[in-house]
Amino acid sequence: KRMNRILEVNESSHYAVVEAGTSQGMLDAYLRKHHPQLKHSLPDAPPAATIAGNIAIHGSGHLSQSEGGFHSEMVTGLEVVLPTGELVKLGSCSTVPAWFSRAPLPDLAGLFLGWNGTTGVITKVGIKLFPRPKYHDVLVYMTEDIDLAPMVLDRVIGTSMAEDINYALAPKPDYLRGFQMTVVNFTANTEEELAFKRKTLRSVMKDLYETRDSGFMPVPPNMKAGFLEAPQKALSKFADVRKGGGFEYVGAIMPIERIPDACRAGMEITARHGITYSLGARIIGRGNAAMFFFAYPFNRVDMDEVERVKKALEETNETALALGGIPWKTEVQGQQAILRQMEPGTYALMKRIRAVLDPEGIMNPGNWEVA
């Protein structure tokens, strides 16, 4: 926790170097105060969540659609302590005194990203920064047909004008019941540019909303403020919909075309277990993937409901794999479900890498291991 210094911000090459305990909120506040023209991609997580922790789990955020994918793909360099106690640097910082890139060197950073702490301990991170435009707006497109999702999302992505694209459906609040919502955030440096982007984003939906089966929702100022937040707080507010403060979810990385099937599966699972839901996705890359969430709130004092949610979560992990997705940030049970479906040669390679880096087997035993 004491390793929380922001060591460098390079305004020209757009990167920051931070210690592993630096939180998302700390970096965001520091940039707003000292480098207001720059920002980093913020996950929908509490401000205390760390930069290093989020990149290590392949996290994503409000710039993942427009600026390069998962946060692990925004890493420009790492400093890591190996299980043997050796300190190593990875990326350009290993060769020259700057943290600007992982290329063109052999990319060893992947040995410590997604491994659940089984290969080493990250102590410093180089992370990409991005310009902070002056203007920010949002459009909300409503549909009644889940199968329209891939088409709607593809059209928005195709404009190359959205900063963040999110899709959601839930039985609460009441205005969402029976509808699906695509939230499109976009930015600009001038009012003219903002107006042009707004017009273009609306135009690509014209043939759809002229049928009156879908359309743009008017967004009043109080609602717009929430949509413009980064990180988004809507899910944390949804956590208390059962008035008990309990909330768990399964995230799954999957192809965009599987979103309709994932929505149906989530509704079927919750109906079987007698619980409620919020379902949705954030687009990663320019349409390369989606981080789909199956979110289940519950009353923590209702132990029967707690057990039903646990069973629903277990079923959801298996369902995500069956849909062609991969459970994200999963616990040991979910990891084992992934490994059962993984190519044997891939898992054998993972074991060999761990044996080389951690010959004594001391780093997070139980993670990424077959039961």
Tell me the role of every PLM-derived stretch.
Residues 9-13, 133-137, 178, 244-246:
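Short glycine-enriched loop/turn motifs at secondary-structure junctions
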Residues 15-22, 43, 47, 66, ...:
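Catalytic cores of large soluble enzymes that bind and process phosphate-bearing ligands
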Residues 5-9, 19-156:
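FAD-binding subdomain of flavoenzyme oxidoreductases
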Residues 30, 256-257, 370-371:
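Feature of Fe-S/electron-transfer and energy-metabolism proteins
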Residues 141-315, 323, 330-334:
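C-terminal substrate-recognition/cap domain of FAD-linked oxidoreductases
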